[in-house]
């Protein structure tokens, strides 16, 4: 995806966007053709405002013209930002404008709404024709940013689903502090937590690192078949809280506009039903201390009470280690600070 700053500062005499000839001397169609020959999709950027976030021409009042231009250039994906938008036109109408323009441009272009969750995006975004919607501000390549976004997402579990996915933002996995969003980078364990959480939420997975420099460890992580399976599961069920106390396992409280679950020490336990009857289980330690007793959950919290005569058999998606429930409980492995573990559980006879 080519983000902001790709165009000239003025449109041409016909009101069309013009690619900067110094940055793209052969034009955007040439770039698209090159990318398509590599077997990849080509994404571009525009904005619902009067100018983009960096002050370049945006698509407000030019939606149909710009959609036609993107189609002519062979664009497959449009990131549509929200900077400097008209205060006289509500957000849902701004995104409907581009949504209907793309629907009539003659090319199948995935519409990625990037309104950062502002103006109650979650309430109206499915009306606009958008295929995905950004629910937070921009991510940065540091643990503090990843953790903040994870905690904030607990507010939006009900609003994800097929047709209009909650886009938690691009992946910073493997950036290692490089790039304009680099703020020191993360450890491998923090990157694992980041990637695993995105997969539990079925977020679009878009690598933000330079794939020409990707290291073996990062490549192994982002191609983990079980994690990808969880992210791409055909049901796209939303995750839900699980825990060791049924009366508290689904409670949420709001603090500074961020939802926190009731687990002590910042440990979050999530489950997600999969298409084949199995269950993804995620154990996320957002704290600075090691998990202890709070890594246990009742099988009843995923709909399998002990009275059913069934047990859960969990398999760690990285190590392959198996854990069998006992007495209606599952005790998972302890995970260290900022670490996580993900399992796929199947229901078996007791």
Report the location of each language-model feature.
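Solvent-exposed beta-hairpin/edge-strand motifs
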Residues: 299-320
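Carbohydrate-binding surface patches
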Residues: 198-201, 206-208, 259-304
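Glycan-recognition surfaces
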Residues: 62-65, 93, 103-210
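Aromatic-lined carbohydrate-binding/catalytic grooves of carbohydrate-active enzymes
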Residues: 1-87
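C-terminal beta-strand-rich structural cap/linker in extracellular carbohydrate-active enzymes
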Residues: 325-350
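Active-site-proximal beta-strand/loop segments in catalytic clefts of secreted hydrolases
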Residues: 2-5, 45-50, 80-85, 111-118, ...
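Catalytic cores of secreted or luminal carbohydrate-active enzymes
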Residues: 193-260
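Conserved, mostly hydrophobic/aromatic
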Residues: 35, 70, 111, 200, ...
């Amino acid at each position: 995806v080519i983000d902001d700053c790709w165009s000239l500062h003025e449109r041409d005499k016909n009101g069309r966007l013009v690619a900067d000839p110094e940055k793209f001397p052969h034009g955007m169609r040439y770039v698209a053709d090159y990318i398509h020959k590599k077997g990849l999709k080509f994404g571009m950027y525009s904005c619902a405002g009067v100018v983009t976030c960096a002050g370049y021409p945006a698509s407000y009042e030019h939606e149909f013209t710009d959609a036609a231009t993107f189609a002519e250039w062979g664009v497959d994906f449009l990131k549509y930002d929200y900077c400097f938008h008209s205060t006289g036109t509500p957000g849902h109408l701004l995104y409907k404008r581009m949504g209907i323009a793309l629907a009539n441009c003659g090319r199948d272009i995935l519409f990625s709404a990037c309104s950062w969750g502002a103006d109650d995006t979650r309430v109206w975004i499915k009306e606009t024709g958008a295929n995905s919607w950004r629910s937070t501000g921009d991510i940065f390549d540091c643990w503090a940013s990843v953790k903040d976004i994870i905690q904030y997402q607990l507010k939006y579990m009900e609003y994800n689903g097929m047709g209009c996915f909650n886009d938690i933002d691009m992946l910073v996995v493997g950036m290692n502090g490089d790039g304009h969003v680099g703020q020191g980078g993360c450890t491998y364990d923090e990157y694992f937590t980041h990637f695993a959480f995105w997969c539990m939420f079925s977020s679009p997975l878009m690598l933000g690192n330079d794939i020409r420099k990707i290291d073996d460890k990062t490549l192994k992580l982002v191609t983990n078949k079980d994690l990808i399976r969880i992210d791409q599961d055909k049901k796209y069920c939303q995750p839900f809280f699980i825990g060791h106390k049924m009366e508290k396992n689904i409670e949420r409280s709001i603090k500074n506009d961020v939802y926190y679950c009731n687990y002590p020490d910042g440990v979050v336990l999530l489950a997600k039903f999969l298409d084949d009857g199995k269950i993804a289980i995620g154990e996320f330690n957002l704290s600075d201390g090691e998990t202890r007793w709070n890594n246990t959950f009742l099988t009843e919290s995923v709909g399998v009470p002990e009275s059913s005569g069934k047990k859960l058999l969990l398999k760690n998606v990285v190590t392959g280690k198996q854990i069998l429930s006992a007495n209606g409980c599952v005790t998972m492995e302890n995970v260290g600070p900022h670490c996580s573990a993900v399992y796929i559980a199947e229901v078996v006879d007791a």
